[in-house]
A protein has these predicted regions:
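Short beta-strand element of the alpha/beta-hydrolase
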Residues: 13-22
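The serine-hydrolase catalytic nucleophile loop
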Residues: 27-35
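Conserved alpha/beta-hydrolase
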Residues: 37-62, 66-67
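Gly/Ala-rich beta-loop-alpha elbow adjacent to hydrolase catalytic centers
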Residues: 145-156
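The feature captures the conserved acid-bearing segment of alpha/beta-hydrolase catalytic domains
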Residues: 164, 169-236
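C-terminal catalytic histidine-bearing segment of alpha/beta-hydrolase fold enzymes
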Residues: 224-257
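A short loop-to-beta-strand scaffold at the N-terminal edge of the catalytic core in hydrolase folds
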Residues: 1-8
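Alpha/beta-hydrolase active-site loop
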Residues: 59-138
Length: 257
């Protein structure tokens, strides 16, 4: 599923929520994505969940074998000299050739990674542009972008690089930076110009540590609109965990309700 739309149960909808699932997830993913997209319309908000395309950066990279240099041919009328080559000389040549090949392969891989990252960003941004345009067609007065997992990264990068005026808020849930991307969340978060809620599970050590770093980075920025909200993982009560998440997100988006 690429996208799922659920209109608001209201004749005058105020908000459209665009939900961006993470890598390996889809538009009705049971963790965070589907519960949120189904609950928001009950409170008068449109919901649109949009799956990410498969990333080129995650595809297996073809190994490029270095082609050995051809030996120079003797000039006409000359015969190649015949003499024994010391074993250590052969070893030195082999080592030098291998080192050159590794440097070339490393450079090629780095260039390919940068190109894939940019291509991935363009494809994802185009999909989010289409989602924003679709929400606007349904008369939403305000648009909120919600990202889950690596979807939070791409939502943040989209707002940082494109700064669409139609999107007024960002919610990041259990945010993760994908592998092999140009910018990480730590560098993106301070650049955001819209109010941002960063929801993380305080009971998960890795998530808590990453969230702490993002919080410190945001504090170094003047007039930051960044706010963190902690969640408690409930492995034995997933329904309760999802309800907790919805209440925290809704409470931040509409504190007066």
């Amino acid at each position: 599923l690429i996208a799922l739309w659920k209109p608001a149960d209201d004749s005058d909808p105020q908000v459209a929520v665009i939900i961006v699932p993470g890598a390996g997830e889809n538009a009705d993913w049971p963790d965070a994505v589907d519960p949120l997209r189904r609950k928001f319309p009950d409170f008068g908000w449109h919901s649109l969940s949009v799956s990410l395309p498969d990333l080129l950066a995650d595809a297996p990279q073809a190994r490029v074998e270095a082609t050995p240099a051809a030996a120079p041919e003797p000039a006409a009328g000359e015969s190649a000299p015949v003499k024994d080559t010391p074993a250590d000389a052969n070893a030195n040549v082999a080592q030098a050739t291998a080192a050159d090949a590794e440097v070339a392969q490393g450079t090629d891989a780095e260039q390919a990674s940068e190109q894939n990252d940019q291509a991935d960003a363009e494809r994802i941004f185009a999909r989010l542009d289409a989602a924003v345009a679709y929400a606007q067609q349904h008369n939403a007065r305000s648009i909120v972008l919600i990202g889950h997992g690596s979807g939070a990264y791409w939502a943040a990068r989209y707002l940082s690089e494109k700064q669409p005026p139609q999107v007024q808020k960002l919610v990041m849930i259990a945010a993760q930076t994908p592998a092999r991307v140009e910018h990480d969340l730590l560098s993106l978060t301070p650049t955001l110009k819209v109010p941002t809620a960063d929801l993380y599970f305080a009971t998960r050590t890795v998530d808590r540590h990453a969230a702490m770093q993002r919080l410190q980075a945001s504090k170094r920025q003047k007039d930051s609109h960044y706010k963190q909200l902690s969640l408690i993982a409930m492995p034995a009560n997933k329904a309760g965990e999802q309800e907790q998440l919805f209440r925290r997100v809704r409470g931040w988006m509409s504190p007066q309700q």
